[in-house]
């Protein structure tokens, strides 16, 4: 699939520039991923690497933005819940004020989904939150308030924080979606070479396939005459 590296890079840059639109960009990726799973897989791999870098550098603003994107990809079922649960375990393993703040923000975004798809693991995460709250852990009062507000939000079944806004629930059938399962600690290749233009030696054949696929996705009818014209054009170009 041509341009998938560029598309992923553009989506990640747009999300970083405007995290408030994370759910909108995730909805776009969900639709694209349902037709081209390799794009969703590539984006998710790059996102995992970005999360690792932000965590290792203790870059809270970057981490807050990136985990928000991941949360909405989990909500859209582009990503499985494994990465989300591993992320929370990593953030809360040795809690600090910053990691607790990021964890709370993440759960607010995708808590409704995690509660639905993995209730037992989600209960364990909240046991960890309560343990941190009761032990104090020398956390700032603000962080303790964040945890308490999260517990209250859970009791209300995440009222005001739906997994997917009705306007962004675009896929007609959940079975259309392809969910990617990977670990936060997997060895990952971001395939940065895909961001660079390379000549396609079979451009004409691939362009014809692309046109047919585009018509199918957009619901355009392809007549036999159009197919014959495409074949004739290919033969003329090759000749």
Model-derived features: where do they sit?
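Conserved P-loop NTPase catalytic core
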Residues: 168-172
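Extended alpha-helical domain cores of large, multidomain eukaryotic proteins
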Residues: 177-239
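Eukaryotic alpha-helical solenoid repeat scaffolds
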Residues: 1-145, 153-164, 174-180, 189-190, ...
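Structured beta-strand/turn binding interfaces of compact recognition modules in eukaryotic regulators
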Residues: 150
